[in-house]
């Protein structure tokens, strides 16, 4: 984003994640002089997020459900959003925003793409098909990141095994 302040777009599927889970972090970025934008599907927590001084941009097709057509639309929405905003950083959170947002950010030539793994969708007890799908999606999206952050040692170890 052109201007004097660096800009960061945080991407989640739901506005409640932006407001309740990431709210203090977003406020800290804003207090440090960043232009902070939250991007998610619209919902009832947008007003509370904006009351924190965080701009919200709706991504209508970014939902938790797995719908390939809606997911492609969400990826296009994210690409257009990043092209229009020209942020310095895109930071994705959770599996689906990471799978869609990291490639979209790289395609839009965002200078820094960061992802936080808040947990992996596939567990050892899940079927082989699901575990393989998650691994392929995560590895592909991680190739689009400049930095990958994890919140627990189990996910760090799993991702290291996956390569």
Residues covered by each model-derived region:
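Nucleotide-sugar donor phosphate/pyrophosphate-binding loop at the beta->alpha transition
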Residues: 19-22, 69-76, 111-114, 121-144
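Conserved nucleotide-sugar phosphate-binding/catalytic loop shared by glycosyltransferases and other
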Residues: 31-73
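An amphipathic, basic-hydrophobic alpha-helix
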Residues: 60-89, 99-107, 132-140
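Active-site proximal beta-strand in glycosyltransferases
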Residues: 7-12, 89, 106-120, 138, ...
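N-terminal subdomain of nucleotide-sugar transferases
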Residues: 1-41, 55
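Short His-centered aromatic/hydrophobic patch
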Residues: 92-98, 117
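Short beta-strand scaffold positions
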Residues: 40, 91-92, 149-151
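A short, active-site helix/loop in glycosyltransferases that binds the activated sugar's phosphate group
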Residues: 47, 143-163
């Amino acid at each position: 984003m052109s201007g004097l302040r660096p800009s960061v777009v945080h991407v989640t599927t739901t506005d409640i994640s932006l407001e309740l889970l990431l709210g203090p972090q977003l406020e800290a970025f804003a207090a440090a002089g960043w232009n902070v934008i939250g991007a998610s599907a619209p919902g009832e927590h947008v007003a509370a997020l904006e009351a924190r001084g965080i701009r919200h941009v709706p991504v209508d097709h970014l939902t938790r459900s797995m719908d390939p057509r809606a997911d492609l639309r969400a990826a296009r929405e994210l690409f257009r959003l990043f092209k229009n905003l020209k942020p310095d950083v895109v930071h994705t959170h959770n599996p689906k925003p990471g799978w869609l947002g990291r490639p979209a950010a790289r395609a839009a030539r965002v200078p820094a793409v960061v992802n936080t793994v808040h947990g992996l969708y596939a567990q050892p007890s899940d079927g082989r098909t699901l575990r393989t799908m998650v691994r392929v999606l995560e590895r592909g999206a991680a190739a689009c990141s400049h930095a990958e952050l994890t919140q627990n040692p189990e996910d760090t170890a799993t991702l290291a095994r996956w390569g």
